[in-house]
Amino acid sequence: MNDSKNRYFVKNTANGSFADIATLFDGVAVLMMTGLSSKGKPVNIYSEQWVNEQEEDFLITTLDENNNPVVIRENVDIELTFIVRKKYATNQENFDVLAKHDAFVDYMTNTDVWLKSAYMGNKYVHCVCEKEYKPTAIMLNRGDNSYMTGTITLHTLDATKVEAVTPQSKQET
């Protein structure tokens, strides 16, 4: 049984619909996704402390349409840790751990993707893999006990967004 079903979602087009990773890639279980709620270091705040003062002067260089300061942050990385194993597949007939692993990694690393976690409500993020990927464990040729694990690091391309919930999309997730 795959306990990660209906918890982690992905799509590879802006207008597409989010699909459950465990359903889209039968046999893949997401173990952990970190960084979705992280905030990067501010890049548009400047401060200076003067020799004869305890207080610092500061400037936030970006303003919104009402002249209110807006902090701009560096984009962060998301880490997606997963396992591919026959026992997590709904259809176990002719299940190939290596082929399923390669298909999943190709999908996640060959183009930009959008990720969403049920643990974070309707928050989602647009990201792309900019780093190399290496499996963390390769245990093949062990019959039904064969598996592969890995962690894919994806760089966010913009700030985390919140998906508008419609009655139809609420039923799907």
Q: Which residues make up each language-model segment?
A:
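Extracellular/virion structural assembly segments
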Residues: 1-173
